[in-house]
Amino acid sequence: GDLLPEAACIVNPNVGGCDFPSKALAGCGVMFYVLMALRTELRNRGVFDRTTQPRLDKLSDLVALGTVADVVQLDHNNRVLVAQGLNRVRRGLACPGINALFEVTGRDPANATARDFAFGIAPRINAAGRLTEMGIGIECLLTDDPVTAQELAQELDSLNRERRELEDTMQLDANALVSHMDWEHRATVTLFEPDWHQGVVGLVASRVKEKINRPVIAFAPDDEEGLLKGSGRSIEGIHLRDALDHVSKMRPDIIERFGGHAMA
């Protein structure tokens, strides 16, 4: 809603009064600019100079991957972030985790594209968070040891295969649900099955959205009894997060918490 949490500092390009031109930053992009501002401040205070300051360009591959994986709008600023990161990958300077993930996907980092991030690397990192523990993906991206990175990348690849099998089963369920509803005359579509996995509903929503060109939210039972956890995907012209914000204000008893951006 419009109520901001109590905090010493809130960094969000969408907060009222913020003149930062790019309003579609992913969280990793926000953090990258925070680090840049912090580096500038520390340099001005004499903590280091331009020759001894931390090299933030070493993070550009991670920023690019996070920007693509978060499916944010690729405005000019985000395109610059992605291009810089891809350039680092192509020059063989990516972190061991990204290099290992390129290897397990059979893709060539020397010719890396945003599609490699979106359809090769990101699904394997996300598979850990969807099915078990996101920490596996984080550890893979943070390790400096190529051997450890390779082992973790293999584990992520295995989890992704498991995720695909689960997604295929849930997609059959979703297709059956859609076939029995008059979706052509609906502004939005919501789907639910009691045995769906909450970590995969976003993928199901995305596929159905592409098929019927409607905003779709898919739900699964939450770990907390009595609640459902959903994930949505929207279409051009309908800002999903703003729509959920409107619903939460009209019916605060329906939505426990939510987040996201225009398209997801």
Language-model segments: which ranges?
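Short, well-ordered coil/turn elements that cap or connect secondary structure elements
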Residues: L4-P5, K211
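Short gly/pro/ser/thr-enriched loop/turn and capping motifs at secondary-structure boundaries
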Residues: G1-L3, C9, G17-D19, D223-L227, ...
